[in-house]
Every structure is written in C-alpha cells, then in structure tokens.
C-alpha cells in the first residue's frame, strides 16, 4: 500500500487546486475535478515525469440521478476516465462533474488521448453528454434518427419506438412501441405431501 500512498501524495502535489478532491479508497486513487480544470488535469497526469499516465483505458458517462436507490443531491452527470501508467504500473480514475444537468457539456480529451475518440462518442450516444472540440461527435451505437439517450435513468425500458420490416413498403419502418405492460401473478401450487413421502 506504500505505493498507493506515494501516488496519492504525488497527485495531490502535482495537481494542487486543479483537483477539487483526491480520494484514496480500496487501493485506488480517484481525482475529482471541475469541468474548467479537466483538460489541465488530464494533461498534467499524462505529462508529469513522476506520474506518466500515458494510456486512457476507458472513458464513460455516469447518470447519478438515483445513485444508491435514492435521489441524488449533487450534479446528475459525470464523465469518468480510467488512466494507466505502463511505466509505473499504476492506475488512476478521473471524475469530472458536468455543470449543466439539462445540457451536459464537457471538453473533449481526444487531443490528449487519441483513444478517447470512440469512448466519447459512446458517452454522447448513451447519455447525451456533449464533448466540445470532438472531431466527429455523432452516434456510434444507435441509429442516427434515434430519439433520446438509452442509458439515462429516465429513459423508458421499452423505449419510444420499435422498428419492423413492412411488407407493403418493402423497407424497415419505425412505429410507436406496442409493448403492453402486464401484471404477472405467481401461481402457487400446493399439494399434499409435496416434497416426497
């Protein structure tokens, strides 16, 4: 655990006021920062000679609106990045809270980490988080005409539309979802001597 403590102290020393919070828990370091410091934090983590987090392993959006089965009191959306230092064999997590819940926007880190390209597109597609200065921010997993963002917690489980092939038109069409919710009542069977004898 000494290396985690050393990493924690180094990160706190390097980032200073740019990090709003540095958390060391369960053998992992998490850096939380505001959107205005996101680019400088990511650049410092990559370029500082003692840190050298040269690889972005993952980036995802998170909707905290009902975190831990309660109504969340803070910002609704965050972008979470997982960084790896191959040189030092260490990992770190960076969480940036998005300022506006209605129109979530954060700066793109594609210029710092090339691997962020498709991850940011996925976060945009699934959560509706916009990434400023992204070179090609468009949907990556859903159709271009898709309405909404399916990983948001307020998105209906069955969606809004379904697609099917129309024989008359000889093409795929969209139509409102025809799934009807049903109530399932469990059937209880009680028999004498059930379970053997």
From Swiss-Prot:
It is a peripheral membrane protein. This is NADH-quinone oxidoreductase subunit C. Belongs to the complex I 30 kDa subunit family. Its EC number is 7.1.1.-. InterPro entries: NADH_DH_suC, NADH_quin_OxRdtase_su_C/D-like, NADH_UbQ_OxRdtase_30kDa_su, NADH_UbQ_OxRdtase_CS. NDH-1 is composed of 14 different subunits. Subunits NuoB, C, D, E, F, and G constitute the peripheral sector of the complex. It catalyses: a quinone + NADH + 5 H(+)(in) = a quinol + NAD(+) + 4 H(+)(out). Keywords: Cell inner membrane, Cell membrane, Membrane, NAD, Quinone, Translocase, Transport, Ubiquinone. One of its GO terms (cellular component) is plasma membrane. NDH-1 shuttles electrons from NADH, via FMN and iron-sulfur (Fe-S) centers, to quinones in the respiratory chain. The immediate electron acceptor for the enzyme in this species is believed to be ubiquinone. Couples the redox reaction to proton translocation (for every two electrons transferred, four hydrogen ions are translocated across the cytoplasmic membrane), and thus conserves the redox energy in a proton gradient. The keyword Oxidoreductase does not apply. The gene is nuoC. It holds the Pfam family Complex1_30kDa. Its main location: membrane. It is found in: Cell inner membrane. GO terms for molecular function: NADH dehydrogenase (ubiquinone) activity; NADH:ubiquinone reductase (non-electrogenic) activity; quinone binding.
């Amino acid at each position: 655990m000494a290396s985690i403590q050393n990493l924690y102290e180094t990160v706190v020393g390097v980032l200073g006021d740019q990090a709003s919070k540095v958390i060391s828990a369960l053998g992992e370091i998490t850096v939380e920062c505001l959107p205005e410091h996101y680019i400088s934090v990511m650049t410092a983590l990559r370029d500082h000679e003692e840190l050298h987090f040269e690889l972005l392993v993952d980036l995802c959006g998170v909707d905290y609106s009902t975190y831990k089965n309660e109504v969340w009191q803070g910002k609704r959306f965050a972008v979470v990045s997982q960084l790896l230092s191959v040189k030092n064999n260490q990992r770190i997590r960076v969480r940036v809270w998005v300022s506006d819940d209605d129109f979530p926007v954060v700066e793109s880190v594609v210029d710092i980490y090339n691997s962020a390209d498709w991850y940011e597109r996925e976060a945009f597609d699934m959560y509706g988080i916009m990434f400023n200065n992204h070179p090609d921010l468009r949907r990556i997993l859903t159709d271009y005409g898709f309405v909404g963002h399916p990983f948001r917690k307020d998105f209906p489980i069955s969606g809004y539309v379904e697609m099917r092939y129309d024989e008359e038109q000889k093409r795929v069409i969209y139509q409102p979802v025809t799934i009807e919710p049903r109530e399932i009542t469990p059937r209880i069977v009680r028999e004498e001597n059930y379970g053997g004898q």
